[in-house]
């Protein structure tokens, strides 16, 4: 395999071509892209090191920020250091091996500069059952207050059976 390192970015793959003059690279075959505490895996990567933009095909990801998130997509676009766009995506904050809930979206934008996620053509699924569908909704990525739906809550009891709660938070004042 081949390894590329620059600052906090490391790329590993079977094949890698790098144009030093323009800062562009292409990698294929078992691509692993690491940036800070984020990990991305895919089949093919085109990336511009000068502005942190590029495309990763058939990605899986694990992002360890204030809240760990993981998922996959048909395609992932790097839109700068802290901005991602995923097409045909699924996303969860559940621990690996536990997919109790997940968000599926035709397009999922994650902007860690603004601490906001935006899902288009979205479905919120609980144990493979869609519990909410929305053409568009936004959600916070960090611990910032924002009016909107909160993470789903799940419970199981012998008295009531399975329960799903979808709380709504109304941020009346920014403080």
Question: Can you describe what each PLM-predicted range is?
Answer:
Residues 1-175:
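Structural signature for solvent-exposed beta-strand/loop edge elements and short helix-capping sites
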């Amino acid at each position: 395999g081949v390894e590329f390192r620059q600052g906090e970015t490391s790329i590993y793959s079977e094949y890698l071509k790098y144009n030093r003059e323009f800062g562009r690279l292409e990698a294929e075959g078992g691509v692993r892209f690491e940036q800070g505490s984020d990990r991305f895996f895919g089949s093919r990567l085109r990336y511009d090191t000068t502005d942190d933009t590029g495309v990763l095909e058939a990605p899986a990801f694990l992002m360890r920020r204030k809240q760990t998130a993981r998922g996959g997509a048909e395609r992932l676009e790097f839109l700068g250091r802290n901005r991602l766009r995923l097409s045909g995506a699924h996303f969860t904050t559940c621990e690996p091996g536990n997919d109790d809930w997940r968000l599926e979206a035709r397009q999922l934008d994650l902007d860690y500069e603004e601490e906001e996620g935006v899902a288009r053509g979205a479905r919120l699924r609980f144990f493979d059952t869609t519990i909410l569908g929305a053409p568009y909704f936004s959600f916070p990525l960090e611990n910032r207050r924002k009016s909107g739906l909160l993470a789903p809550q799940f419970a199981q009891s012998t008295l009531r059976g399975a329960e799903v709660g979808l709380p709504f938070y109304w941020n009346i004042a920014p403080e």
